[in-house]
Amino acid sequence: MRRLWTVGCFSRLIARHFSSVARRGERPGGEELSRLLLDDLAPAQRLERLFGLSPCLLALRAARRRVARLLLQAGKAGLQGERAELLRVAEARGIPVLRPRRQKLDALCGYQVHQGVCMEVSPLRPRPCDEAADTSSGDDPQQLWLVLEGLQDPRNLGAVMRSAHFLGVDRVITSQRNSCPLTPVVSKASAGAMEVMDVFATPDLPGFLQAKAQQGWLVVGTVGCPGPEISQSSKVPITSCLEFVWDRPTLLVLGSEGSGLSQEVFASCQLLLTILPRRHLPPGLESLNVSVATGILLHSICSQKKGFPVQERGQLLQDS
């Protein structure tokens, strides 16, 4: 017990020393001290390493994760701008700040593109789907929820979340089964949007869709460029995303990268949207990457959003 107490005190003392000189960009304590801090005092279980400037900064601002320590690459000139803000926020919250060399930080981040920034944090988990209804605005006829079934590529999921946040999607719902968890790779691919969005998960996606349809929501599935055989065999009407009219609360449902929507989810859809190509396509090129398709579909729908103040639009144009 005394040994554990001594190690704990030493760790806190060293962490304070690192934080006090972090502003100056120095590498305190030498290589041996850094190796002790980063290897021997390994992160506690159930922590993960979040990497990248935007994910780490947005995670600190949102304060939804527990942060064990912040790692800033040694030798980064000046710690200005967002890196300086990272340091200020971390020190204000008493978060230890370490300054490893790039080679060490590369290894800690699994050789991902980390931009000289990494944080050891508690994971983010999707919230139960019943909480989505509790926090929604039921009287808004132009609510748009994005529903994802079985997306497994973390970079696709991150890119989808980035587009959803940018274009004003109200909720993101995922299937619990066969879906990518909310990992640091997802957060990096989302440019940190994952850190500020509420993501919900349901164990019964077809049941969820059917329940929302009974509440008056329109369940809209998605399909690749339909050939004549698909158009004739489908019992669900198919329309171009450019012809879709958004006049009631809508669930936009996208399927997995390989197989698309499952039969159960497909059967729950009341309408199918497609993106029509601008040329004849050879076999194998009839569809788009799911994150690209999501951006196009969301933009075509969200451009119909009513009630966006003229003054606010003008301010956004001026700021850009």
UniProtKB/Swiss-Prot annotation:
The encoding gene: Mrm1
Gene Ontology CC terms, in alphabetical order: mitochondrial matrix; mitochondrion
Transmembrane segments: none
Record function comment: S-adenosyl-L-methionine-dependent 2'-O-ribose methyltransferase that catalyzes the formation of 2'-O-methylguanosine at position 1145 (Gm1145) in the 16S mitochondrial large subunit ribosomal RNA (mtLSU rRNA), a universally conserved modification in the peptidyl transferase domain of the mtLSU rRNA.
Family designation: Belongs to the class IV-like SAM-binding methyltransferase superfamily. RNA methyltransferase TrmH family.
GO function term, MF aspect, one: RNA binding
InterPro entries recorded: Alpha/beta_knot_MTases, MRM1, MRM1_MeTrfase_dom, Ribosomal_eL30-like_sf, SpoU_MeTrfase, SpoU_subst-bd, tRNA_m1G_MTases_N
Record flagged with keyword tRNA-binding: no
Catalytic activity: guanosine(1145) in 16S rRNA + S-adenosyl-L-methionine = 2'-O-methylguanosine(1145) in 16S rRNA + S-adenosyl-L-homocysteine + H(+)
Protein name: rRNA methyltransferase 1, mitochondrial
UniProt superkingdom: Eukaryota
Organism: Mus musculus
Compartments (UniProt record): Mitochondrion matrix
Keywords for the protein's UniProt record, in alphabetical order: Methyltransferase, Mitochondrion, rRNA processing, S-adenosyl-L-methionine, Transferase, Transit peptide
Assigned EC number: 2.1.1.-
Class in the EC hierarchy, top level: transferase
Residues forming coiled coils: none
Transit peptide, start-end: 1-17
A Pfam family recorded for this sequence: SpoU_sub_bind
Keyword Plastid: no
